[in-house]
UniProtKB/Swiss-Prot annotation:
Zn(2+) binds at residues 105, 109, 115. Belongs to the endoribonuclease YbeY family. This is Endoribonuclease YbeY. NCBIfam families: rRNA maturation RNase YbeY (TIGR00043). Its cofactor is Zn(2+). Single strand-specific metallo-endoribonuclease involved in late-stage 70S ribosome quality control and in maturation of the 3' terminus of the 16S rRNA. The lineage of its organism: Bacteria, Pseudomonadati, Chlorobiota, Chlorobiia, Chlorobiales. The gene is ybeY. It is found in: Cytoplasm. PANTHER family: ENDORIBONUCLEASE YBEY, CHLOROPLASTIC (PTHR46986:SF1). It comes from the Bacteria. GO terms for biological process: rRNA processing. One of its GO terms (molecular function) is metalloendopeptidase activity.
Length: 137
């Protein structure tokens, strides 16, 4: 798997642990990854991408663009660190845990998961919880 991590902010991130999170999901889902680009950005970039691709004029925690087909996982995702920080406060959790939850969530989208329906959201949340437990034992 070729994983490119791009951090467009000044905030320090643990690239090795982020890579491990992506690999954990890919392996756990029994999938093969080709190329994945993970972009960690601020509100301005997130808002621009959200507006351009989803016609929503606000920053969001993550936007995923899957390119893979069949059993392959390929694509890119953008995670807004400003929104992650806000959500961590709102959900009474720490920044790192929320960052990894959303990273896992993004990779699940690349692997074909959807969260439009309540049962799909529940299924994704269960997978996220499982992978978070593996990462933070």
């Amino acid at each position: 798997m070729q994983l490119q991590i791009h951090n467009t902010t000044r905030r320090k991130l643990d690239d090795a642990l982020l890579c491990r999170a992506v690999e954990t999901v890919i392996q756990g889902e029994g999938r093969h990854a080709l190329e994945i680009a993970a972009v960690y950005c601020g509100s301005r970039m997130s808002r621009r991408i959200n507006r351009e691709y989803l016609q929503h004029d606000w920053p969001t925690d993550t936007i995923s663009f899957p390119y893979g087909s069949g059993g392959n996982v390929e694509g890119e995702f953008y995670i807004c660190l400003d929104v992650i920080e806000e959500n961590a406060r709102r959900f009474n959790t720490d920044f790192e845990r929320e960052l990894f939850r959303v990273t896992i969530h993004s990779v699940l989208h690349l692997a074909g998961y959807d969260d439009h329906l309540p049962e799909d959201r529940r299924r994704m949340t269960e997978r996220e919880d499982s992978y978070l437990q593996q990462l933070f034992r």
